Amino acid sequence: MAKKYVYYFGDGKAEGASNMKELLGGKGAGLAEMTNLGISVPPGFTISTEACVEYYKNGKHYPPGMWDAALKSLKRVEQSMGMGFGDPERPLLVSVRSGARASMPGMMDTVLNVGLTTKTVEGLAAKTRNDRFAQDSYRRFVSMYGSIVMGVPREHFEAILKQKKAEVGVPHETHLDARHLRELVSNFKALVKEETKKEFPDEPLEQLRLAVNAVFSSWFGARAVTYRRLYGIPDSWGTAINVVAMVFGNMGETSGTGVAFTRDPASGDKNFFGECLMNAQGEDVVAGIRTPLPVNALAKNVPEAYKELEHTYKKLEKHYRDMLDLEFTIQEGKLYMLQTRVGKRTGIAAVKIAVDMVREGLISKQEAVQRIGPEQLAQYLYPIFDTKEESKSNPLGKGLPAGPGAAAGKIALTPDRAVTMKAAGTRVVLVRQETSPDDIHGMNAAAGFLTARGGMTSHAAVVARQVNRALTVQVALTDLV
């Protein structure tokens, strides 16, 4: 019997479960478990970590039967959604996301909107009666695929986008209309051709295959390797890949995306805590490029979806008996859950959450003690500002506290500079407009860091809480000049 490498989930049933994290990765196991619990999850399938290990053993070739099994599962997704992958009238689009067994926030790659072509983008526009949405999805896809799969520097796409906003005279891309976005797609494709000497792929299955290759390859990307070295994660584990039917947070003002924690990851308070963006896609929140809204803003914008989100997070926390990190998308008022995992937290939050969960009868005292590591207890000894002196001070800037403690040091404006300064014996504070997962080496070298953009749920904030670094986000950097 052929080895099983692909596990389907959808329509309330999944071939996996939460206890299969080693095989399905954390994300895949979470998607399977939420599906089995009857929570609203888009259909999809997980390619196992074993497939990734075999991919590298075989000289970057898929193990026997993997691709055929993936295509069979894709057919099941098509049937569930009533759409076709590559169908010019009812196009199914998918996301291709990494998911290792150990959480590695932002360290590997994700590609959204796979399946968009010159034909399917017109079908998407006609089906949704929303040309702007279709063109916005296409320009996002070309830039993401172009950078992750085809190796064009992300900054080159951002420069073209910045130039277009300046031409039109708008502050943000949400103000660009369908015509402007079509022009961006053309400009992005021209950039890809110029940089790679290749045409942007216009065949959906080719897009999918190359996206899967790119996500497998990101397991040995520089930032993923650095992260694994820091946290003792073996190279031999490999990553799973989740191919999931796209749901869209960028379809208008009743659509959005967000990241939330079932309790405050900084303080441990029993408050539903998170951030969201309306008319946006998931990477917009965690990338820290745009400053998000608090998650409870959804109660006003999409009240029914917010009620369902509240019900869902309570159900999941009770089921997992831990504080959870959630990702979700709302498409025209309907909630879809995209991820659940045990949330990273500060040491102070870890102690409070453990004590509170004992009082609530969710865990035993023994479990509470086992959940607190020495590094988390050490945070109680971290330096903080003297409150009396702080009250007398005249701060140059203010922001939100996303990481533990306080820090002092000389400013470094790039991650590489932070590494160099630390090697010379200097304490460093890394200052950036926003951080990305590519900055992990500089974040580890710094005593603390601050950013102008991003929120409390961005990848930077998640990593800061894990590496025990002080982080302040949403600081007006002009105040520091």
Give names to the regions the model predicted.
Residues 452, 474-476:
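Generic beta-sheet signal
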Residues 472-474, 481:
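Beta-strand/loop nucleic-acid-binding surfaces
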Residues 1-393, 420, 426-429, 436-441, ...:
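Nucleotide/phosphate-binding sheet-loop regions of phosphoryl- and nucleotidyl-transfer enzymes
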Residues 398-438:
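Extended, non-globular alpha-helical segments
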Residues 469:
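Residues forming the flavin
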